[in-house]
Curated annotation (Swiss-Prot):
Belongs to the UPF0161 family. The keyword Methyltransferase does not apply. It comes from the Bacteria. InterPro entries: Membr_insert_effic_factor_YidD (IPR002696). GO terms for cellular component: plasma membrane. This is Putative membrane protein insertion efficiency factor. It is found in: Cell inner membrane. Could be involved in insertion of integral membrane proteins into the membrane. Keywords: Cell inner membrane, Cell membrane, Membrane.
Amino acid sequence: MAERSDPLTRGLVALIRGYQVAISPLLPPACRYYPTCSQYTLEAVRRYGAIRGSWLGIRRLCRCHPWHPGGYDPVPDLPGSAPEENGRPSPDGQHSGSGG
């Protein structure tokens, strides 16, 4: 999915990058996930825009606590964002979408 470029998304990306560059290096590592919560939110906002990306980031932050094991947790592909939609066959030859 292409990166969003509306003003709100650009502003959020700038704020997250500012945190990553100016604040995060001063704090001890605390994130239990890979990618880190700030990197996850940055990618989510770039991929899905300010509203949906922020929601994904907030949900991730709520999961990042000492009682959760953490681990690998990439930004999900949301339904309908797969390249094989609209009835075109996927690489394994199966059809998807409403056509077909």
